[in-house]
Amino acid sequence: MSCPAGVANPFASGGYSAGLAVAGEDPHIVPPLSFASLPLSSPSHVAETPITERAELVQVLASGEKPSADWRIGTEHEKFGFQLDDLRAPTFEGARGIEALLTGLTRFGWEPVQENGRTIALLRDGASVTLEPAGQLELSGAAVETLHHTCVETGTHLDEVAQVAGELQLGFLGMGFQPKWRRDQMPWMPKGRYQIMKNYMPKVGSLGLDMMTRTCTVQVNLDYATEADMVKKFRVSLALQPIATALFADSPFTEGKPNGYLSYRSHIWTDTDADRTGMLDFVFEDGFGYDRYVDYLLDVPMYFSYRDGVYHDASGTR
């Protein structure tokens, strides 16, 4: 990856600020604010003070407003791992497993995050490395000032991964959909939230488990100055989604054969979970803003609640 020389390290400034989230190769789920768009794989966080009133949720969105001088960009980068000898997806356990990869990355200053005694994520200077359900490796980058900083950050991450992966005889592939293996041949990571989602997804669509185990993406999170600015950016990002899907289409293979799609990943989202996917038409209606988006959020069924370090199944609860 080639980036401009002389770009200072910006990563000590902290993690994501509130901002718009725009994804490619095919986005379909587009929550506009980073508190709602934390990666599927992101470590869980618990608010110090419980939210008891709807107005508090609106205030969370409003509190993300920033002057343009303070705007930042946060990038999320996902990729599939595979064993170099047989091309199979690595399991979590084992000498060549995903946990071994995460442990190897700690030599670069990443701090391990554990769940039930297992390392399931890494943290460093406002960024994190996390796991999607089948072990897809995700960099959730720090909040940085420019695309050049994002380029440096992603390039550094990929170089670190390549060093450790090479020692484990692993490779990584950036594509929208797993090109070779069936769903039942994909491993599952030992994370509490994923077991809940694994049980729930077949109830709301036929392709949700494929979304979890066989897709990858790149996302960008953007800041906003005012409610009006948020609305404008949200509308523009949604309007550009079909173009982004076409430009970055990269999933033409399924189980080793052409699947007839340029973006099979886009097709996956058509039958995953209608309650939380698809185009959000109400964003283009007059009067859309923080209040209307909170109404939408409150109408989406929950997956789980997280209390005292334990995931509690709340799937389907409104």
Regions found by a protein language model. Give the residues of each.
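Exposed, low-complexity/repetitive linear segments and helix-based recognition motifs
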Residues: V22-A23, G135
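Loop-rich catalytic cores of soluble enzymes, especially ATP-dependent carboxylate-amine ligases
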Residues: F172, F177-R318
